């Protein structure tokens, strides 16, 4: 599911398949002949559409065979526009005992998340972001993970994409976020939103949170967000008891406080309208491979329009600081035979936009970028939303393990990112 989805029901994509920006974890092996692992099995590809029958490998080979090259050979990479300021990874944190998974338990997912962030920092990657999902075999409580990463690193940004605010106690979250930010030295970039379709029906109510009379789930998420943002600015939120507060009689803020955190809150927006709302309130924009509206134009153009409207609304609001904008993409360079083994099928299945239905509304899903590094650089340079953003988040197939994903990020950093104007 793309960050910032603001729908209600589970999305249904082409041919009735679920349509998230990242697919679910591996299916359990049920016997018979093992299938060849695919990128979609490991939580990476942009769509869920999976064709039955033989793959058209000849067509794929014509496009990507030349990309299989020895490490260190950047032949074919050419500078094609751009000025990307930051590149990070976005892990959906899938774990499970399915066939081929190298992330079989929750402990594996957490510990590998730490190690991947350490490796990414060594590669020069700018950010380590994690998806938050409840009632699923994914990351559900991000602050312990982010704090552990902060303690092992010194430069890389740490963040979420996104936290479902329906589930959050705003004041407790403010305490945890400030603590993680202080441990990191001010590197926390916190993506929040209304949340996504989920396995549980009314899951937030099981956590003790239900909409007030006349509220929708989205209204509740925004109410929690307002209380959270107020708390992290140091505003008083609880009446002092003079007997135990040193004689204080006013309102007490939560502690600790981390200066500057309020400017590093991002809203995951699924529509152009919500992006404008986020800009008016002074939150950064986090956009993904899914928008819960469709105007008939290619996904990247619709997303670029969302970004433009966000920036215009930000300027009109007169905020003092410059906002940040991120987009997420599935980028899978084919550099060696191992990459070819995992990603060949994705080049055929996921290399185009798709349209699905979420909560009765038409939604548009972005494509995956799979193939030769020079081809990916050219395609990303033509992606108007990527060019409009300052931060690119790369979804990773986390169940393929730390070593593979570190190699994938290294290939992007070496062969693709420089052509977008990014540098370490």
How would you label these PLM feature ranges?
Residues 84-106, 167-237, 293:
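Flexible, glycine-rich active-site loops centered on histidine and acidic residues
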Residues 127-146, 289-300, 395-404:
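Glycine-rich, proline-tolerant flexible connector loops at the mouths of alpha/beta enzymes
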Residues 3-26, 30-58:
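Polybasic, low-complexity intrinsically disordered segments
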Residues 87, 124, 132, 149, ...:
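Conserved, mostly hydrophobic/aromatic
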Residues 96-110, 163-170, 261-269, 364-373:
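Active-site mouth loops of central-metabolism enzymes
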């Amino acid at each position: 599911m793309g960050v910032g989805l603001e729908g209600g029901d589970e999305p249904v994509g082409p041919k009735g398949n679920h349509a998230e920006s990242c697919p679910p974890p591996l299916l359990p092996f049920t016997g018979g002949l093992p299938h060849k692992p695919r990128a979609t099995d490991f939580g990476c590809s942009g769509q869920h559409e999976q064709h039955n029958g033989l793959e058209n490998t000849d067509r794929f080979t014509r496009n990507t065979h030349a990309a299989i090259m020895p490490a260190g050979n950047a032949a074919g990479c050419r500078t094609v526009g751009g000025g990307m300021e930051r590149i990070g990874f976005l892990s959906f944190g899938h774990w499970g005992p399915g066939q081929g998974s190298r992330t079989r338990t929750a402990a594996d997912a957490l510990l590998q998340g730490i190690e991947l962030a350490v490796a990414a920092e060594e590669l020069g990657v700018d950010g380590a972001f994690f998806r938050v999902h409840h009632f699923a075999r994914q990351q559900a409580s991000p602050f312990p993970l982010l704090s552990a990463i902060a303690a092992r690193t010194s430069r890389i940004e740490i963040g979420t994409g996104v936290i479902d605010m329906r589930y959050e106690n705003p004041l407790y979250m403010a305490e945890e976020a400030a603590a993680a930010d202080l441990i990191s030295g001010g590197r926390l970039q916190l993506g929040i939103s209304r949340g996504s379709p989920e396995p549980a029906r009314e899951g937030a109510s099981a956590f003790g949170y239900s909409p007030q009379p006349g509220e929708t789930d989205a209204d509740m998420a925004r109410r929690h967000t307002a209380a959270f943002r107020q708390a992290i600015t140091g505003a008083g939120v609880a009446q002092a008891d003079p007997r135990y507060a040193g004689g204080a009689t006013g309102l007490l803020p939560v502690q600790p406080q981390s200066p500057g955190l309020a400017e590093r809150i991002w809203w995951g927006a699924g529509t152009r309208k919500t992006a404008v709302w986020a800009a008016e309130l002074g939150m950064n924009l986090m956009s993904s491979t899914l928008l819960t509206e469709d105007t008939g134009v290619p996904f990247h153009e619709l997303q670029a329009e969302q970004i433009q409207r966000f920036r215009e609304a930000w300027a009109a609001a007169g905020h003092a600081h410059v906002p940040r904008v991120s987009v997420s993409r599935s980028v899978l360079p084919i550099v060696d035979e191992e990459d070819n083994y995992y990603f060949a099928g994705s080049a055929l299945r996921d290399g185009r936009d798709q349209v699905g239905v979420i909560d009765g509304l038409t939604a548009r899903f972005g494509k995956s970028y799979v193939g030769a590094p020079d081809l990916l650089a050219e395609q990303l340079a033509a992606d108007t939303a990527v060019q409009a953003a300052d931060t690119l988040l790369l979804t990773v197939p986390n169940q393929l393990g730390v070593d593979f994903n570190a190699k994938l990020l290294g290939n992007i950093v070496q062969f693709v990112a420089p052509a977008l104007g990014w540098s370490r």
